[in-house]
Amino acid sequence: MKRPAAKSLLTAAILGSALALSACASTRVSPVEVTRFLDPATRAQLGQGSIFVTGVGGEDSLELAPYKAAVARELARVGYGETARAAAGQIAEVRVSRYQLGQNGQRSPVNVGVGGSTGTYGSGLGLGIGINLGGGGGPEIGTEMAVVIREARSGRVLWEGRADFTASENSPLAERAASAQTVAAALFSDFPGNNGETIEVEVP
């Protein structure tokens, strides 16, 4: 009389495991596409000295805060010392866009930190066409970050870069804090990078 119950429990356990594996398999994360531009003549100025991190146009919204914090951590890792604007030798301007990527590759805004192009190299950062790298399934949430580093005194652009990736909406990396660290870490990997080069950084 006890065997059918045991068999039912085993069947339920197998079904539960299968459903869990299915949920894991449906989580998709693309590589981070990174493009960077720099003035070779000023390469020596990068990765040292004091820097102030801000949103484009002084934007200081709560939505932008985790991205600014992630950028500040990466800048410290590559050699900068974060300081107040008045004492900074360089300024890092951060722009972030979050979007939903449909199966046809079209973007629908989720939320926007600061819009528009941020640099002066004619790169039009943030205006690229999104490509859905995942298979079938639900929508994907994309995060795009652009950062420009300028001389504080002259406003001259020393470096600019963009990082963009997508994750299925059920992935932990679709959350704001996790996506902030993901794009920032990729953007500043092997900093400052090569002028005009686009690379893909795998997400661990």
Show the residue positions of the predicted features:
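Acidic helix-start/capping segments at beta-turn-to-alpha-helix junctions
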Residues: 83-102, 203-204
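Bacterial N-terminal signal peptides
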Residues: 11-22
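A structural "domain/chain start" motif
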Residues: 2-3, 7, 22-78, 197-204
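C-terminal/domain-edge helix-coil "capping" segments
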Residues: 25-43, 136-204
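Surface-exposed short loop/turn segments
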Residues: 95-156
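Solvent-exposed loop/turn segments at secondary-structure junctions
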Residues: 58-59, 98-101, 165-166
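Structured segments of extracytoplasmic/periplasmic soluble domains
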Residues: 70-81, 99, 186-194
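Envelope-exposed proteins and targeting segments
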Residues: 47-49, 71, 78, 88-92, ...
